[in-house]
Amino acid sequence: MMAAEAGSEEGGPVTAGAGGGGAAAGSSAYPAVCRVKIPAALPVAAAPYPGLVETGVAGTLGGGAALGSEFLGAGSVAGALGGAGLTGGGTAAGVAGAAAGVAGAAVAGPSGDMALTKLPTSLLAETLGPGGGFPPLPPPPYLPPLGAGLGTVDEGDSLDGPEYEEEEVAIPLTAPPTNQWYHGKLDRTIAEERLRQAGKSGSYLIRESDRRPGSFVLSFLSQMNVVNHFRIIAMCGDYYIGGRRFSSLSDLIGYYSHVSCLLKGEKLLYPVAPPEPVEDRRRVRAILPYTKVPDTDEISFLKGDMFIVHNELEDGWMWVTNLRTDEQGLIVEDLVEEVGREEDPHEGKIWFHGKISKQEAYNLLMTVGQVCSFLVRPSDNTPGDYSLYFRTNENIQRFKICPTPNNQFMMGGRYYNSIGDIIDHYRKEQIVEGYYLKEPVPMQDQEQVLNDTVDGKEIYNTIRRKTKDAFYKNIVKKGYLLKKGKGKRWKNLYFILEGSDAQLIYFESEKRATKPKGLIDLSVCSVYVVHDSLFGRPNCFQIVVQHFSEEHYIFYFAGETPEQAEDWMKGLQAFCNLRKSSPGTSNKRLRQVSSLVLHIEEAHKLPVKHFTNPYCNIYLNSVQVAKTHAREGQNPVWSEEFVFDDLPPDINRFEITLSNKTKKSKDPDILFMRCQLSRLQKGHATDEWFLLSSHIPLKGIEPGSLRVRARYSMEKIMPEEEYSEFKELILQKELHVVYALSHVCGQDRTLLASILLRIFLHEKLESLLLCTLNDREISMEDEATTLFRATTLASTLMEQYMKATATQFVHHALKDSILKIMESKQSCELSPSKLEKNEDVNTNLTHLLNILSELVEKIFMASEILPPTLRYIYGCLQKSVQHKWPTNTTMRTRVVSGFVFLRLICPAILNPRMFNIISDSPSPIAARTLILVAKSVQNLANLVEFGAKEPYMEGVNPFIKSNKHRMIMFLDELGNVPELPDTTEHSRTDLSRDLAALHEICVAHSDELRTLSNERGAQQHVLKKLLAITELLQQKQNQYTKTNDVR
């Protein structure tokens, strides 16, 4: 509460009043807070307080009040609410009044008596500021809170590894006032001079960048006496540093002052104030009203509304804050005019009335306003000061607000960073006994300050023609990606890769691509691959912000297809800080790309106390990229392979930690090993037992060891034209080179298949490759029942090709049914050993049959979605098996089902996350249902009913019988593409890299190829030519390497 002080320009007794706690008046060492002149003729009606014969009265509310008579002279009075009133000596008239100001204003009457009274309506209360004869109190020193209100991030928010979520910054943050650290537009050199003049490590300031208008820089003096500059991106009212989002620069300062380090072990400590106050925000005023278009980021406004401009976007659009409503959004520049620096900075605030008289302010409050309404206008008594007008039940009171030299505002002896802070304070605290500030009286007759001759018709027509498609300048790439949120949630968001400023910006949707949901400054990031094992889904990658000393914070993304994910990764890598140090080479230079293959084999003698279900986490440097499955026991065997391709150039080691699988959201790392890549001989596999170290005390227990096979390779890629002769030899229609490589590359079959497929796809010869290899496989097979059962180069190529081209078909055929299974709580369990007590197997069977009917129907209807080239290859398979086994009438059906169902549809049903059909793991009921559905669909595709092996599944047999004929028709129809279709799609592959990789395979197996060339008659000439070209390419590569070294 605050005692209202009477104010007049006439003489009379003086009263000092202050709201808040700990104020003191009347001491020569601590001057009075304020003085109030009271009219000599003021009527007083209350019990008199004898002895107040002199003019000095000081009142403080809450806390201790101290008054020394030396300053005010005889008759000084200290009044304190809720505290002690103490008077210094010097006169017998000194009195301590503990009740001063309880019922209203403490007022001294003309007779020298003191009265407690509520002021009449005719009286206006206004405190006097610095002009009243006493200097203002200096502002209290800024004291950062000791741990209070800083907030913590819940460990449970990151279930799958280190993760940064922009929501995590929404915690209470405190920072010094803006005027203590904001310097406006300032160049780098002057900023460094100001910090060095301050002379304290931990000193900082924020400035607007002189190189990038609209963005800011945090300049910081480190303990090493080095000034570091950190880029801050301002975007639509938010501020981003690295990838962290803050709603204000003050929040950013608070975060790096109290929550996180800016450099290792260093926080923001000492703000450096500018030499003089800075107010450089661009302001504009509406010259016409506007109503927003629904479902956009536009804002509606009135004529006369004032705006702060945050961002100037393309095509005349601006992102602003409406000072009247505090609403942020889009406006177009045609509807506004510039506001000059000479206009009051509070113009546009809903409570500010800069162009009305004192009498008009009274009239507004009494006619338009209600009790507890208020407004602020410039003071008539003291230019530069302000008056807060406030309506009570009986009168209108006013309080003087005085700006201070250090950009604060004083009212009633308290100091605030802004007038808005004063208003917020007295919305919560009583300004007068029993009263709080409530609604401001809005600005009336706004038209009077504007040019009424503006013709809006043409302006509105111009706005309708404007589009919002060009808010961002240099859009290198755009589209949808999945982004991982808190826990295990993934959300489909719209992304823009902005090339001019190296920013990845994301939005809720393409329709609302104005104010970002988030922004990542790629100049301080690196892109890392994410293995499928980490989240149980494919096509993932991560952006790691690495600029600051704090633990890396990470953004995870997933593409719908491998090609989409790879395309985004390559696009992002071109703008990442670490990639800029090694730009793409020209056609006459050698490119180098590194990769790492890890085989986590087994562990030995893990501590029994700590491990029952151990698994491994794999890190590149300190960034997690993969994990193994959990295995039981102290000597677990994993035998899992992990391939990390195109490593960022800063990767210099891999780390493997061992954790124990529990039901906790995140299992701690217990043991670890670390290996520098420089230890590995490039291109050669190593097989080694690594002794493990411990993150926790093991108390004399040996930590055990881990067997890892690793191969680190550095690909040297020459310009594409250097491989032209090599490519011609590979693409010969007889495929002699392909056959030879399949013979010698048994261990590298998957790698060989992926390289060959990309090369032939690039040349639009994938049908030649697949049909020829399939025909060869069929011709070499004697038993129809074992055709394509073994894993060969042909079957591996077919599987890879289907996954690469048939994703749309899989989603169309399966997604709806699988989503229903995920949502359903109804079991389909038929096995007696797995049924719950009192569970009705007939209900479960009915539910399973309903799912199967719907799913199979969708599959049958999706045949036209399969790519025509794939269907042509199926047709070639059917013709080949008919020619090989003319009397086997089911073979043409089963050869296609073996690929479509066994290697595509059923794997997608069993593991829908791996096909990006779902993002979350299925519940135990849903997982079991998926297994039963896959079993049933596979048997239908094989045209086989369930029998004695799984008798509990016999209830599905009627469904299989009734759909056999339709299945045969469906599979036959898939192959009904007799001619190879023309395709306009061009596969986006790095052909020179694939050719270089194939060349490295030839080099690695050159001895086997040489032996083979001496054995095979028809292929002998081709293989000897292959060996000669391989040797020639090796020599050219050495020449390029020498040239690069010279440069």
From Swiss-Prot:
Pfam families: C2, PH, RasGAP, SH2, SH3_1. Gene3D superfamilies: C2 domain (2.60.40.150), GTPase Activation - p120gap, domain 1 (1.10.506.10), Pleckstrin-homology domain (PH domain)/Phosphotyrosine-binding domain (PTB) (2.30.29.30), SH2 domain (3.30.505.10), SH3 Domains (2.30.30.40). The keyword Lyase does not apply. Residues 279-341 form the SH3 domain. The modification Phosphoserine is found at residue 831. Changing residue 763 to V: In CMAVM1; uncertain significance. The modification Phosphotyrosine is found at residue 615. Inhibitory regulator of the Ras-cyclic AMP pathway. Stimulates the GTPase of normal but not oncogenic Ras p21; this stimulation may be further increased in the presence of NCK1. This is Ras GTPase-activating protein 1. The lineage of its organism: Eukaryota, Metazoa, Chordata, Craniata, Vertebrata.
